[in-house]
Amino acid sequence: MSALKNYGLISIDSALHFPRSNQLQSYKRRNAKWVSPIAAVVPNFHLPMRSLEDKNRTNTDDIRSLRVITAIKTPYLPDGRFDLQAYDDLVNTQIENGAEGVIVGGTTGEGQLMSWDEHIMLIGHTVNCFGGRIKVIGNTGSNSTREAIHATEQGFAMGMHGALHINPYYGKTSIEGMNAHFQTVLHMGPTIIYNVPGRTCQDIPPQVIFKLSQNPNMAGVKECVGNNRVEEYTEKGIVVWSGNDDQCHDSRWDHGATGVISVTSNLVPGLMRKLMFEGRNSALNAKLLPLMDWLFQEPNPIGVNTALAQLGVARPVFRLPYVPLPLSKRIEFVKLVKEIGREHFVGDRDVQVLDDDDFILIGRY
């Protein structure tokens, strides 16, 4: 009870022992404002659960320098759980072919279909197995600021090198609310802001990015609006990664982008590295454009999921609502692989045309 008294609370028992008062005193008690003798809310009660130990933390500049970041696919077992063996093979292949970072649980990795327990576990697994060889950037963004805070705290506690944050979608907010949302997570560690209005239905305008860029933890922007926006930022010294694979060559070499956060690099990581590192290469870009068009004919990650299954590096298991591309498109993919060269693609099996019956669609997992 002594602890309760410190917060200005009165027990029911003690209330029974108040002396009987006259009518005026009773009236005053009913209408008086209750004032706590000690503030009930400790001022720093909601500080983030962050460690003050910085010796193993990634410097924001280490994130800003990355040119090829793969939005890594999450493969599944037939019962819908993560296939960690296949996942590890995918990440190892990225490392061997020169990718410098992976986005864990992004749109491509289907973070939107994961529980937060699954999501944070996969970030921790990736850090534990590969954190010394590749930068691990966890997609800990959410349209709920509360969830974004909690997930980002846990992700950095797991050892991720950076966070990817999207603006609040569906329940859209004001410009001021958008800025406030990002400010709550920026102080936790290196952060990439993700602008993809095609999915969120709300653009992050330059005025927000310019304000956020004053925070030293803002590593840069994954920008999907287009190259004019990319150049608007790079001219002011803001680091930008193209979020559009079909524009990333020109973004890099004509508009100042640092690199790309790529879906296509799940399939051809070596060629995507070449596209970002070895100077302007219009011939290679033209060679890859048909593959990129094929990948995004339906919303991502449908195309990459289908392709990795046909290449034999991931089981043909889809978490609904995603379903594979139709048979005619699967036949097209086999032709694309042969035109580009099987040796450039991940895995070592022959590319196959899978039948509809080969795919497993999971609704409960």
Curated annotation (Swiss-Prot):
Q: Where in the cell is it found?
A: Plastid, Chloroplast
Parts of the chain that traverse the membrane: none
Which positions in this protein are listed as binding pyruvate? 108, 261
Q: Quote the cellular component terms of the Gene Ontology held in the record.
A: chloroplast
User: What EC number(s) are associated with this protein in UniProt?
Assistant: 4.3.3.7
- Supply one GO molecular-function term: 4-hydroxy-tetrahydrodipicolinate synthase activity
Which PANTHER family does UniProt cross-reference here? 4-HYDROXY-TETRAHYDRODIPICOLINATE SYNTHASE 1, CHLOROPLASTIC (PTHR12128:SF15), DIHYDRODIPICOLINATE SYNTHASE (PTHR12128)
Q: Which GO biological process entries does UniProt record here?
A: diaminopimelate biosynthetic process; lysine biosynthetic process via diaminopimelate
- Return the Pfam families for the record: DHDPS (PF00701)
- Site entry: Part of a proton relay during catalysis: 107, 170
Feature: transit peptide:
1-39
Please give the family membership noted in the entry. Answer: Belongs to the DapA family.
Active-site residues, Swiss-Prot/TrEMBL: 194, 222
What is the main EC category here? lyase
This protein's UniProt keywords: Allosteric enzyme, Amino-acid biosynthesis, Chloroplast, Diaminopimelate biosynthesis, Lyase, Lysine biosynthesis, Plastid, Schiff base, Transit peptide
Q: Which reaction does it catalyse?
A: L-aspartate 4-semialdehyde + pyruvate = (2S,4S)-4-hydroxy-2,3,4,5-tetrahydrodipicolinate + H2O + H(+)
Q: What is this protein called?
A: 4-hydroxy-tetrahydrodipicolinate synthase 1, chloroplastic
Signal sequence bounds: none
Main site of residence?
Answer: plastid
Per its UniProt record, what Gene3D superfamilies does this chain match? Aldolase class I (3.20.20.70)
Tell me which InterPro entries the record gives: Aldolase_TIM (IPR013785), DapA (IPR005263), DapA-like (IPR002220), Schiff_base-form_aldolases_AS (IPR020625), Schiff_base-form_aldolases_CS (IPR020624)
